[in-house]
């Protein structure tokens, strides 16, 4: 099957200063575990250069995630400097503890972005703002604190709106938990940056329950919007994304009935959703994984031993990749025939994609499914 990739992710580091209980990263390790595996600067440049070149040649979006990318600022700047396509960097904003630091870091990023003269290059700084990053936790001395303070996010956003030309995108989540975006906008208003929503776009495939004068009713969920601010000439972009129940987030309850219904349909029917491979992810140790923030179930190779071109070429003939794109229910059927007891676990999945993830994270079962698909 022909690969139709949209993005390639590059992870400068999988380390993170926060310890969010609901971290989606299923591979996330402790600092002690990661320290022995992470690369030095020159080795990382070798894999980053290859990943960026792969994206440039194919016009793919480069996503820089983590961990927390700004723990390795020099690596981030190197990736941006080499890109000839769109770059989207996601940060928790932990580092913007005060306005001085926010300005200093942003000015370095802005300088490299401005120096990149490629006609097809563009850059967006995306800031996570959700209950999971802003969760209030108890510290060892018994005091309450936010995992990533809203104040830090306000410093980052204010510096970008008032003093920086970079594109900014806020990333809240569809969730039944409290939305700290409200507190962030209130803090910005106290700083003279009163927000106004200028344009809204809704997701018709996801409906949320709200209370109105006539009781409870469902409405399409907000997908994205543009925010304008008083005393600032530029806008911020707002983009809602769903919480997938993988990694630490697998302990969450269903966020919305819509997801649960889709999972039930997928388990019962011989048709439905398809999951073509949309991206590849390159970790800070050179390992390459399939998927964009979802299918980190197995490693496809290491860039110190092979190339992305070779990996991509092999994926076009991979039975699992083909099945994901054309008939993922076959993966589900083979898995349930081999392990009927797995159904109860799959019924808890927050979406059909997460159900597939739960199947493929079992190494032995994944190998068995691959052999069955190849033998058809």
Model-derived features: positions:
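Canonical Radical SAM [4Fe-4S] cluster-binding loop centered on the CxxxCxxC motif
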Residues: 1-46, 54, 292
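Flexible mid-to-C-terminal extensions adjoining Fe-S/redox cofactors in radical SAM and related proteins
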Residues: 285-376
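Radical SAM/AdoMet-radical enzyme domain recognition
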Residues: 45-63, 72-187
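A short local loop/turn or secondary-structure capping micro-motif enriched for an aromatic residue
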Residues: 30-32, 87, 273, 296-301
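A C-terminal junction/extension of Radical SAM enzymes
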Residues: 163-291
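Short acidic donor-binding/metal-coordinating loop in glycosyltransferase active sites
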Residues: 12, 66-67, 129
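Pocket-edge positions in alpha/beta enzyme catalytic cores
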Residues: 35-39, 68, 300
């Amino acid at each position: 099957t022909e690969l139709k990739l949209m993005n390639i992710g590059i992870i400068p580091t999988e380390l993170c200063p926060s310890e969010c209980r609901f971290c989606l990263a299923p591979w996330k390790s402790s600092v002690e575990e990661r320290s022995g595996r992470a690369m030095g600067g020159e080795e990382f440049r070798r894999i980053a250069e290859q990943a960026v070149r792969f994206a440039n040649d194919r016009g793919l979006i480069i996503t820089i995630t983590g961990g927390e990318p700004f723990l390795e600022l020099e690596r981030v700047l190197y990736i941006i400097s080499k890109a000839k396509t769109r770059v989207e960097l996601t940060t928790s904003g932990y580092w913007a503890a005060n306005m001085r630091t926010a300005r200093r870091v942003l000015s370095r990023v802005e300088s490299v972005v401005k120096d990149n003269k490629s006609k097809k290059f563009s850059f967006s700084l995306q800031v996570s703002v959700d209950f999971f990053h802003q969760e209030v936790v108890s510290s060892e001395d018994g005091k309450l604190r936010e995992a990533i303070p809203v104040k830090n996010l306000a410093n980052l956003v204010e510096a970008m709106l008032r003093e920086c030309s970079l594109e900014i995108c806020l990333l809240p989540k569809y969730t039944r938990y409290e939305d700290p975006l409200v507190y962030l906008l209130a803090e910005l208003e106290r700083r003279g940056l009163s927000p106004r929503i200028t344009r809204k776009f809704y997701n018709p495939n996801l409906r949320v329950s709200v209370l109105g004068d006539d009781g409870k009713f469902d409405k399409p969920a907000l997908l994205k919007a543009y925010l304008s601010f008083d005393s600032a000439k530029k806008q911020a972009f707002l983009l809602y994304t769903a919480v997938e129940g993988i990694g630490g987030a697998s302990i969450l309850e269903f966020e919305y009935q819509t997801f649960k219904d889709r999972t039930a349909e997928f388990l019962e029917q011989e048709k439905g959703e398809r999951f073509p491979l949309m991206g590849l992810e390159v970790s800070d140790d050179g390992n390459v994984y399939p998927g964009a923030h979802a299918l980190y179930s197995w490693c496809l190779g290491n860039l110190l031993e092979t190339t992305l071109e070779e990996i991509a070429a092999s994926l076009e003939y991979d039975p699992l990749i083909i099945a994901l794109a054309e008939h993922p229910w076959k993966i589900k059927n083979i898995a349930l025939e081999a392990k009927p007891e797995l159904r109860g676990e799959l019924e808890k999945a927050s979406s059909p994609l997460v159900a597939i993830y739960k199947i493929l994270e079992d190494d032995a079962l994944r190998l068995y499914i691959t052999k069955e698909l190849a033998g058809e």
